[in-house]
Amino acid sequence: MPVDSKLIRNFSIIAHIDHGKSTLADRILDATGALTAREQKEQFLDKMDIERERGITIKAQTVRLDYTAKDGQTYRLHLIDTPGHVDFNYEVSRSLQACEGALLVVDATQGVEAQTLANVFLALDNNLAILPVLNKIDLPSADIERTTREIEDVIGLDCSGAIPASAKTGIGIAEILEAVVERIPAPKGDPNAAPRALIFDSWYDSYRGAVVMVRVVDGIIRKGQKVRFMATGRDYEVTEMGVFTPHATAITELGPGEVGFLVGNIKSVVDTKIGDTVTDAVHPATTPLPGFKEVKPMVFAGIFPTDSAQYEDLRDALSKLHMNDAAFVFEPDTSEALGFGFRCGFLGLLHMEIIQERLEREYNLDLITTAPSVVYHCYLNDGSMKSIENPAKLPPPNLTDRIEEPIFRMTVHVPSTYVGAVLALCQERRGEQKSIQYASSDRVIITYDMPLSEVLFDFHDKLKSVSRGYASMDYELVGYRADDLIKLDMLVNGDPLDALSVIVHRDKAYARGRDLAVKLKDIVPRQQYEVAIQAAIGSKVIARTTVKAMRKDVTAKCYGGDISRKRKLLEKQKEGKKRMKMVGSVEIPQEAFLAILKID
C-alpha cells in the first residue's frame, strides 16, 4: 500500500555555487541514518568526478529518507537535489515542480547571490514553501543579521523563522528536519484518479535502457502496468520500479506524492523528455501536467578529433553522452581545415565544458573545439527565415534582409565599490541597461539586456576580474533582436579558412579581424613565397598581415662584378617566387587552429 500522503514531504535545496548545498544534503542523510559510517563521504549525491572536483551539481539526484519527528510520527522525506547552474535552468524548474517546499541555503558570510535569486524565483513560480537556512554560521566572518536583512530586502521573504546552521559541523540539522515536517505542506493528489506523474530526470543504463525519475501527482503507478509518455505518445510496460534510499531499492507501486524511478525497455533518453507526463496507456489522463517545453541548445561548436583515426570513437562517445543527456545534440560536420568532426549543440558554456571534459577524460579522446557560436535567425529577402548555427553557412549579404541574434537578460550582483567597472564592461559588450537596484547599502543588482554572443567568450572571466571575484551573474533568454551583424572571413593566400569564420557586429569587425590576422601571422609556417593573411567582410578586405618569404641568398656566389649581374639573379628569383605563389597552397598545421581557438 502506498504511504498516506499526509506523511510525505517533498523538498529540494536551492543555493548559489559554494553555499554548502551538497554538504547540507550529506548531513541530512547522516541525521536520518541513510548512510552507514563506511559510506559517508563528501558530496555523497554528486556521483560524477567532475561534480566533485568542480564542486557543482550537474544531474539532479533524489533520495527517500524515513524520519521520525518529535510528534512520534514517521515521515517519508524525498530530498530532490537540483543543479544550481543557470545552464540547467529548465532541469531545476522541473525538479522544483516535483516538490512542495525548498530549503533556501544562503552562505552567511556571502549573502544573497545571483543564482540564489534566479532559483528562488523559479521556486516561487511553482508556489513552493521556502525555508531560509543561514549556512556556515561556524565561520568567524558570518554575519547573520546582514544576511537575514538581505534575504528580506532582495527576495521579500519573511526571515523570522530562518534557521541558523552549519552543514560542516552539523549545527541546526535537527531543526531543519523538524521545520521540513512542520512548515512544508503535504502533497495533494487523488489516488483514485487516472495516473499522472511528472518526469523530472532520466539517465541511461547500459543494461536496462533509460531510467526515468518521476513524481506521482495523481493515481497509482504499478509494476507491470502499461504507461504512456504524453509528449511523445509512446507506450511502455513498467518492468521495474524503485526508490533511492540512497541505494536503489525495488518496490511494486508508487502513490500520489511519492518519488521513484521506472524502467521499461526505453531505448534512449531522447524519448523521456524532462517535464513530460507519464499516464496509464489504457485509461490515460485527459490533460498533461503544465509547464512542459522542449529544451533547445543555445550554444554550438564544432568538435573535431586531432587524429582522424579517432572519428568513429568520437561518434560512439557522443552517441553515449546523447543517450544520457537529451539536451546535447550533434550532427556530422566537415571542415576544410580540420577534416571530419561533429557540430554539437549545448545549453550553455558550462554544459559545453563539461561535455568536452567528459569526452577527453572518460573516452580518452584528443579534441579540437572550434570557437562557440550562438543560433542566429537570418531573414532572407523572400521573407523566409533560416536558423544559422555555423557561421560558415550564412547566406551571402545580397540575399539577406536582416540577421537577429539571441538577447539575454543579465542580472549581476556586485558590491557597490565595483559598480562603475561592471557598468563599463556591460556597455562595452553592447549591453542595454534595464535597471539598477540597491539590495543593501553595499550590494547592487544591475540588470542588462545583452547579446549572448558577447557573453559567450570571456564575459564571466572579465566580470570576475573587474569585481575582484565578488560579482555573481545569472542570465535568461528574453528573445531575438536584429542588429548590424556581418560575417568575418579569414583568408590565407586568398583561400578562406572555414573554421575561423565568425559572425560579429560591424563596429567590432575591424578589431576582431586585426587580432586574428596578427595571431595567424605568428602561427602560419613560412613558405618559399610571401603569404598574405587577410580578414574580409564579403569581398572587402579590412585587415592584412604578411608572412615574409624564406629566400636563398642567390647573390652569394657573385664576388664583386657588375650590379646588373646581381640584379639579373634577383629578378630571376622573384619570377620563380611569383610562379610558386600562383600554384602554391599553404598547409596550416592543426596546432595553429588550437592556438587560435585557445586565444579566443
From Swiss-Prot:
Subcellular location, record wording: Cell inner membrane
Entries under SMART domains matching the protein: EFG_C
EC number: 3.6.5.n1
GO molecular function, one term: translation elongation factor activity
Entry keywords, A to Z: Cell inner membrane, Cell membrane, GTP-binding, Hydrolase, Membrane, Nucleotide-binding, Protein biosynthesis
UniProt membrane topology term: Peripheral membrane protein
GO cellular component annotations of the record: plasma membrane
Keyword Transmembrane helix: no
Limits of the tr-type G domain: 6-188
Purpose: Required for accurate and efficient protein synthesis under certain stress conditions. May act as a fidelity factor of the translation reaction, by catalyzing a one-codon backward translocation of tRNAs on improperly translocated ribosomes. Back-translocation proceeds from a post-translocation (POST) complex to a pre-translocation (PRE) complex, thus giving elongation factor G a second chance to translocate the tRNAs correctly. Binds to ribosomes in a GTP-dependent manner.
CDD domains xrefs: EF4_II (cd03699), EF4_III (cd16260), LepA (cd01890), lepA_C (cd03709)
Species: Sorangium cellulosum (strain So ce56)
Family note: Belongs to the TRAFAC class translation factor GTPase superfamily. Classic translation factor GTPase family. LepA subfamily.
GO BP, sorted A to Z: positive regulation of translation
Binding site for GTP: D18, H19, G20, K21, S22, T23, N135, K136, I137, D138
UniProt name for this protein: Elongation factor 4
Gene this protein is translated from: lepA
Enzyme's top EC category: hydrolase
Record's catalysed reaction(s): GTP + H2O = GDP + phosphate + H(+)
